[in-house]
């Protein structure tokens, strides 16, 4: 693949887990300890490290293992939030969209959306709403929304139903690769002098004189224990944040009302266009998107209350039917279960109560709290505003930890691999170095773009430890085509064995574990 422009940084030596753990053990005290390696935690760690604080991030599983790799892949102001009158949330999100487009142009890209309209009244109302959306974006606008004729709508959305179509509306937002942004943020933490380690779960918080002063953690691979001292501890546990809060205050009431969002991935044939489709009205009061992503079409999402917190949530049968039925009302070629290449779900850490049975109206905003013992916890939030959340959380943490006050610098902080201008290669300026590794010209599977060199790069420089880490988050194979990802597992496991010294038993275990995981991404017929 051709590289993006810009300076070409050297990747440096292979990152050894043993060296990371040795650095952790040799550091007597950290300024900032962040627990949680999703969007929120990584945003906090980048912000803290950029201010010059000694920063440590610990993740119990892999970076973006949970919600942060299972989003609808949008960086957006939120058209439906505008309809709810949440002007401040939309304005902030549009500002953050502009910042992300500037700071990570290899991962975040402008995306045209088209809304097909079948009633003139809807065309009028949507036109007014999207004009307001343009106005809120101001100088950060990606292009003005405009009304389309029925003919232009069909040209933009080949495959959309034409019966009763009166026209459409086009507007601009942005799409991204969520897990790759997470990996890029992790690399940025290291670039800024911080430390981030996956598979190192926190088992307890450490208290002295009634204050949180650190945490105990245990390496999931070796079993080694670490007693970590920190001036301030940040709970960025996502949907599991309440569990961490209760390590500090066992009687702390639950604050979150998790909601599940399911997504389906289809071949591009169902919507052969670079424009995204927005379905403005669904029976549960949401919108449904069909987005071009990684050569496929991503359909989503749902809003289903969950009282449990599974590490591997699965789309429910009713959610799959809901998405397919809704899409079928708008597409001339109706997708069926057997057409689904991958089905996945994520849990949103919404703030509020589900006593009414629905989470669609609960807050997508975030709340920062400081406990009596000084644990800084954040609840809620979304990818679009991750940077702003990180800024606010570190601003809150500074006086709690008695840290010297330093200003935030992430508004104009290019993230790792920044190419200098827009490019579609997620590796950005790392690409030339990636392609010097063995196997740059050999694909792992004919249906995937993943090369042997990219697998080696994930292991050597992106802290990948398993087949899942590589096929789910360093590359998005599991989310794009679960069957092809499943078929690729043995080849990836063989490279892991070569790079990490795994024995035959470990290779078989890795392959079988991923096979079972991928089964959950395949839609039951």
Question: Which residue stretches match the model-derived regions?
Answer:
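A conserved short coil-to-beta-strand element within the FAD-binding core of flavoproteins
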Residues: 198-213
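Glycine-rich Rossmann-fold phosphate-binding loop(s) that bind the pyrophosphate
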Residues: 37-38, 60
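C-terminal accessory subdomains/tails of enzymes that are appended
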Residues: 20, 29, 61, 107, ...
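Core beta-strand elements of the Rossmann-like FAD/NAD(P) dinucleotide-binding domain
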Residues: 28-30, 222-232
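Extreme N-terminal leader/targeting segments of oxidoreductases
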Residues: 1-32, 47-51
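Dinucleotide-binding Rossmann-like beta1-alpha1 core, especially the glycine-rich loop
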Residues: 73-156
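Short hydrophobic core segments
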Residues: 35, 228-238
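Glycine-rich FAD pyrophosphate-binding loop
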Residues: 49-69
């Amino acid at each position: 693949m051709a590289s993006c422009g810009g300076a070409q940084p050297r990747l440096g030596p292979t990152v050894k887990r043993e060296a990371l753990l040795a650095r952790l053990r040799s550091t007597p005290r950290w300024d900032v300890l962040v627990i949680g390696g999703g969007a929120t935690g990584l945003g906090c760690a980048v912000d803290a490290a950029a201010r010059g604080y000694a920063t440590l991030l610990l993740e119990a599983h892999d970076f973006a293992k949970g919600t942060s790799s299972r989003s609808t892949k949008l960086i957006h102001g939120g058209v439906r939030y505008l309809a709810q009158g949440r002007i401040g949330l939309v304005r902030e999100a549009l500002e953050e969209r502009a910042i992300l487009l500037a700071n990570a142009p290899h991962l975040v890209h402008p995306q045209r959306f088209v809304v097909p309209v079948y009633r003139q009244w809807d065309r009028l109302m949507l036109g007014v709403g999207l004009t307001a959306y343009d106005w809120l974006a101001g100088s950060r606008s990606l292009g003005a929304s405009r009304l389309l004729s029925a003919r232009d709508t069909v040209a933009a959305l080949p495959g959309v139903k034409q019966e009763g179509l009166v026209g459409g509306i086009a507007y601009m937002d942005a799409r991204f690769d969520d897990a790759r942004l997470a990996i890029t943020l992790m690399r940025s933490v290291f670039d800024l002098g911080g430390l981030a380690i996956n598979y190192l779960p926190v088992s307890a918080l450490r208290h002295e004189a009634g204050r949180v002063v650190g945490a105990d953690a245990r390496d999931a691979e070796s079993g080694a224990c670490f007693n970590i001292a920190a001036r301030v501890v940040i709970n960025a546990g996502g949907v599991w944040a309440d569990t961490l809060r209760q390590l500090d205050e066992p009687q702390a009431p639950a604050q979150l009302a998790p909601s599940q969002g399911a997504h389906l991935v289809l071949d591009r044939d169902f919507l052969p266009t670079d424009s995204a489709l927005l379905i403005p009205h669904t029976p549960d009061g949401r919108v449904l998107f069909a987005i071009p992503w990684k050569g496929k079409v991503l359909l989503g999402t749902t809003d289903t209350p969950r009282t449990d917190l599974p590490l591997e949530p699965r789309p429910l049968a009713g959610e799959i039917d809901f998405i397919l039925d809704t899409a079928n009302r708008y597409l001339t070629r109706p997708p069926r279960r057997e057409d689904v290449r991958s089905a996945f779900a994520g849990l949103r850490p919404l703030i509020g109560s589900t006593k009414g049975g629905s989470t669609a109206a609960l807050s997508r905003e975030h709340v920062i709290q400081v406990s009596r013992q000084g644990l800084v916890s954040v609840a809620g939030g979304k990818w679009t505003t991750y940077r702003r959340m990180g800024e606010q959380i570190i601003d809150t943490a500074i006086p709690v930890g008695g840290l010297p006050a330093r200003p935030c610098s992430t508004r104009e902080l290019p993230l790792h691999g920044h190419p200098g201008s827009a490019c579609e290669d997620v590796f950005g300026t790392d690409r030339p170095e990636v392609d010097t590794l063995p196997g740059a010209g050999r694909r792992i599977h004919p249906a995937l773009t993943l090369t042997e060199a990219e697998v080696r790069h994930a292991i050597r420089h992106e802290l990948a430890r398993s087949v899942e880490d590589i096929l789910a988050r360093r590359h998005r194979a599991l989310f794009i085509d679960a069957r092809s990802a499943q078929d690729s597992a043995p080849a990836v496991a063989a490279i892991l064995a070569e790079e990490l010294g795994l024995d035959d038993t470990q290779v078989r275990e890795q392959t079988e574990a991923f096979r079972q995981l991928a089964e959950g991404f395949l839609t039951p017929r």
